[in-house]
Design a protein with these regions (language model features):
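Membrane-proximal helix-turn-helix segments that form the acceptor-binding/catalytic region
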Residues: 47-76, 84
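Conserved donor-binding/catalytic core segment of Leloir-type glycosyltransferases
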Residues: 107-127, 131-140, 146
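Nucleotide-activated donor-binding/catalytic signature segment of Leloir-type glycosyltransferases, i.e.
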Residues: 158-176
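Short alpha-helical donor nucleotide-sugar binding micro-motif in glycosyltransferases
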Residues: 175-176, 183-188
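Aromatic "clamp/platform" in nucleotide-sugar-dependent glycosyltransferases that forms part
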Residues: 196
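Short hydrophobic beta-strand element within catalytic cores of glycosyltransferases
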Residues: 213-217, 227
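Conserved acidic donor-binding segment of nucleotide-sugar-dependent glycosyltransferases
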Residues: 229-240, 249-254
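A short, well-ordered alpha-helix in the C-terminal region of glycosyltransferases
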Residues: 249, 256-270
């Protein structure tokens, strides 16, 4: 890929698989993530591939294509240390990590802590919003949860809310516009973001830019590059009881949300272009 009918192409920046497979003499990698199902997710419930000969061949071919294409890059960057670590572990390559600000940087604001914890993201199993919903059964009755986003798990999550009798306390908001997203961050007590081994996770940065503490899990990956337990949020085991205990502490400790949120802002305020 060197030109199109309108203009020459002097630089190609690959981000996700398979974009970085494109061949170009001036190719740079800005790695968001690889095809994780044939790397770190292989052998977990989050991969579609098993140990059959056919699956093993697919894994081999994808990894072979990756290493060829990645070695063609003149410079390697990764979106977070977690993504860079996988590149080192599986491909033997080193990448620099300049953290990118979220798309709405400069527009986030803060407000007084509200009566809800906020979550945002795709409703799928790796984002683990079911964990937040189950944790609400362990949290004070006056605390609510509001979750923005859509995805394949929405119906299952709605069913879980009904099963646990949390219809009045947990709300799935679906897709929302930017202004409402900013408002929901600003008005929250804190932000839940505990996916499984996330590459980076803009939500953590968005929460801290809104001066809100983040509740994450010990196996959440990227968020752990920013969240320090008891300093700007909570890092807990991925269990309903542990998340519920963090929610309870946040909801019942006067001034804690503001203190942790302020420390979070200090942690990410320098992430700019």
């Amino acid at each position: 890929l060197q030109q199109d009918p309108r203009r020459p192409i002097d630089l190609v920046i690959g981000t996700k698989f398979p974009s970085y497979l494109i061949r170009h003499p001036n190719k740079v990698l800005w790695l968001v993530h690889q095809f994780r199902q044939v790397y770190d997710l292989l052998g977990t419930p989050y991969s579609d591939f098993g140990d059959s000969p056919e699956d093993r061949e697919i894994v081999r071919l994808v990894r072979e294509m990756d290493i060829r294409a990645l070695r063609e890059c003149r410079t390697l960057f990764a979106i977070a240390k977690n993504a860079a670590g996988r590149l080192r572990r599986f491909n033997g390559l080193e990448a620099q990590v300049p953290y990118p600000p979220p798309p709405l940087a400069g527009r986030y604001r803060t407000g007084a802590p509200g009566d809800y914890v906020f979550g945002a993201g795709r409703l799928d199993s790796m984002k683990r919003f079911d964990l937040l919903i189950r944790a609400m059964a362990h949290a004070p009755a006056e605390l609510r949860a509001r979750i923005a986003g859509d995805g394949p798990d929405r119906l299952a999550l709605e069913g879980l809310i009904d099963q646990l009798g949390l219809r009045g306390r947990v709300e799935l908001l679906g897709r929302i516009d930017d202004e409402r997203l900013i408002d929901l961050f600003a008005g929250s007590l804190g932000v839940y973001y505990a996916p499984y081994d996330e590459d980076f996770g803009y939500v953590t940065i968005e929460a801290f830019l809104s001066q809100k503490p983040v509740i994450t899990a010990a196996d959440s990956g990227g968020p752990l590059e920013f969240v320090s337990d008891g300093v700007n949020g909570f890092v807990v085991e991925p269990s309903p009881a542990a998340v519920g205990a963090a929610l309870t502490r946040l909801a019942t400790s006067s001034g804690l949300a503001q203190r942790l949120g302020g420390a979070g802002f200090d942690r990410v305020r320098g992430i700019t272009w």
